[in-house]
Regions:
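Active-site neighborhoods of enzyme catalytic cores
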Residues: 1
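Catalytic grooves of carbohydrate-active enzymes
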Residues: 4-210, 221-223, 492-569
Length: 637
């Protein structure tokens, strides 16, 4: 965004450590390294190593470099980056590097089961604590609920611990001789989720007018008006009846059942204003609900699904791949590239023990309807990759641009999946686990010419400059990470296809290689650890075919909708109302967080669009004073 930040790069004379695949020669402040820096004119060279959280030779036995000063350059001082840049460095530079997310080169064990679980658990906790803070803010604002500082802070503490470096790079290592880092992440995120759930439950119990089961209260934790499906947990006994929902104008909304993990939920379409709420009456339906979304087998053996936005055709004879995906809102455009040898939603990877690539298209699949009603239709594709069973689900929702998908693989034994023939050596930068082309991928060959990749990053969207995402050495890493979403778009900005994931992982793409999502790697990993398959693999992902650019189609907001679904609860009889804490002109900004500090409500916003023109924020209420606050809490106005 043009903000300038003075930083310290890796110096040109700072070589990678010979025989290492994880650090540079700066790691130990050796005399040779420091003299190389001094000889090139660097007056106060730094070595970049953060003290670890749990190493046995940590601060209890002295600083990182230890007491043997003969091993490294002296004098050496320990500094924070802020202290170094302000007080020790020259403080200025003539360099003007325009930083990109693709300057961040991470080579973790993407696609392994342990990383999928860890990343998924962290993602759930990240979304949960932010929603909990927002719901707590509503409850304090409207009902005077005490701000649960200790519970919120503890939720953030355990979440931040789960984001620690060692959790992700050595998840199998034992923490203080007990549980592994991955097992500890499960515990840490469990605390965050439990605290978040308790905070939300406390908020909901205060916000609803009274106890009961006749009114549904719905809350929106985003700064955009929403008209979408919401799920409310209801008694199991209700399954014996059909139900309808009424808005404050008395208009009936159809409802549809969904059972997840043994919990009965009723889904209906709710219209809720920005940063606001709406209530609905729920009643038994007097008549059977008519009309369902289409899902039926065709005469040619294919299977067709349809909503008001999409027509989708599956081919059971080719493993249930999607042969056609037409977007009605994009003038009926066909998004599937049937000229590509890879199928759309095909699963394919190199199975080392079988000696070659295996594909879900090699065997026919069974397609069946799991859920069908007036609001959504969901089908299951059951097939095999070699001897291994898989189930893919696809859900189309009326009025919803997002196509929700899931894949579950039931493994037999511990198959090895990835590039073959690469013997692991710790000192060899060449590694089998880097090349995604050999991993089990879900392929999405898309009929888009002159493709350009965009991908989200923390408070940023990156326009990729990569010709492809492929590499096989530690010293040649490319940024192939999908945080929340990746968008493959046409360079003429006519259309695109966005892929969303439920966990941080890697994606694949190249000039002659379609967009694909990493589903599985199994084999040797960092430091020679065997990354095994020891349970079923299950991940969720989603697609949005769209016209125009990611920006025009508000893909960032679509991702936020997926991360923060509407919150709903049952309550007693009440006057049906709706309201909004604040509105932003044109729904221009994203609501990052809402927290109380004393009696002041701090609202953090983010502009994910390129439009930097001023926007009006309108607050509901008479006694409101707003001030702009910097991130370090300085009041600007």
């Amino acid at each position: 965004d043009g903000t300038r930040l003075t930083t310290v790069p890796r110096y040109a004379c700072e070589d990678l450590q010979p025989g290492s695949c994880w650090q540079s020669i700066s790691w130990f402040n050796t005399k040779d390294y420091i003299h190389k820096c001094l000889d090139t004119g660097i007056q106060h060279p730094v070595g970049m190593c953060i003290q670890d959280a749990a190493w046995s030779h940590g601060w209890d036995k002295g600083p990182w470099l230890g007491q043997d000063t003969a091993a490294y350059y002296t004098p050496t001082a320990y500094k924070t980056w802020r202290n170094y840049i302000q007080d020790c460095s020259v403080g200025t530079t003539q360099d003007d590097w325009h930083f990109s997310q693709e300057d961040v080169l991470g080579g973790l064990m993407w696609g392994t089961q342990v990383m999928q679980r860890l990343a998924g658990e962290v993602r759930v906790a990240e979304n949960a604590i932010v929603r909990a803070e927002k719901m707590a803010a509503y409850a304090r604002l409207y009902k005077g609920m005490e701000w649960l500082t200790e519970r919120i802070d503890e939720g953030w503490r355990t979440l931040l611990l789960s984001q620690h470096h060692d959790c992700w790079i050595v998840p199998y290592n034992q923490l203080q001789g007990k549980k592994t880092w991955a097992e500890t992440v499960t515990d840490w995120t469990g605390v965050t989720n439990q605290n978040s759930r308790q905070i939300i439950d406390n908020a909901l119990s205060l916000l609803k007018e009274k106890e009961g089961e006749s009114t549904v209260y719905v809350y929106n934790t985003l700064a955009t008006d929403r008209n979408e499906l919401v799920a409310v947990e209801v008694p199991v006994s209700w399954r014996n009846s059909d139900w309808v929902v009424l808005d404050k104008q008395g208009k009936k909304q159809p409802a549809q059942w969904l059972t997840e993990d043994g919990i009965s939920k009723l889904l209906f379409r709710a219209q809720v204003p920005s940063a606001g709420y709406a209530s609905y009456a729920i009643r038994k339906a007097e008549d059977k609900q008519s009309g369902t979304l289409k899902a039926e087998r065709q005469k040619d053996g294919t299977f067709r699904m349809e909503s008001d936005l999409y027509t989708l055709v599956l081919n059971p004879s080719k493993g249930g791949v999607i042969e056609s995906l037409k977007a009605k809102a994009v003038r009926g455009k066909e998004f599937v590239d049937n000229r590509n040898e890879r199928g759309f939603n095909e699963l394919r990877g190199y199975f080392i023990d079988e000696g070659g690539f295996l594909s879900s298209m090699d065997q026919p699949a069974e397609v069946s309807v799991l859920e069908q009603g007036p609001l959504f239709v969901k089908v299951a594709v059951k097939g095999k990759i070699g001897k291994y069973s898989f189930t893919q689900t696809i859900r189309l929702t009326q009025g919803e641009p997002r196509i929700d998908m899931n894949v579950k693989l039931d493994w037999t034994g511990n198959p090895r999946i990835g590039e073959p023939g690469i013997e692991f050596r710790a000192d060899n930068p060449r590694k089998a686990f880097y090349d995604d082309r050999y991993k089990l991928l879900v392929y999405l060959p898309t009929q888009i010419a002159n493709q350009q990749i965009y991908k989200d990053a923390p408070f940023d969207v990156c326009e990729s400059r990569l010709e492809n995402t492929f590499f096989n050495r530690w010293d040649s890493i490319k940024h192939n990470i999908i945080l929340n979403w990746v968008d493959v778009a046409s360079k003429d900005n006519s259309c695109g296809l966005s892929l969303f994931t439920d966990h941080t992982t890697s994606y694949a793409h190249g000039k002659d290689f379609p967009l694909a999502l990493n589903v599985q790697y199994a084999g040797k990993g960092l430091w020679g650890r065997d990354y095994i398959i020891d349970r079923p693999t299950e991940i969720s992902y989603a697609l949005i075919p769209h016209a125009g650019t990611w920006e025009k189609s508000r893909i960032w907001t679509q991702s936020e909708r997926r991360n923060e679904p509407l919150v709903a609860t049952l309550g007693g009889d009440a006057t049906l109302t709706s309201g909004s804490l604040f509105r932003i002109e044109n729904n221009a900004y994203e609501l990052v967080s809402m927290v109380y500090k004393g009696n002041d409500l701090y609202i953090r916003l983010f502009n994910a669009q390129s439009d930097a023109s001023p926007k009006t924020i309108t607050f509901q209420g008479q006694d409101v004073k707003a001030s702009l606050v910097e991130l370090d809490n300085r009041l600007v106005e």
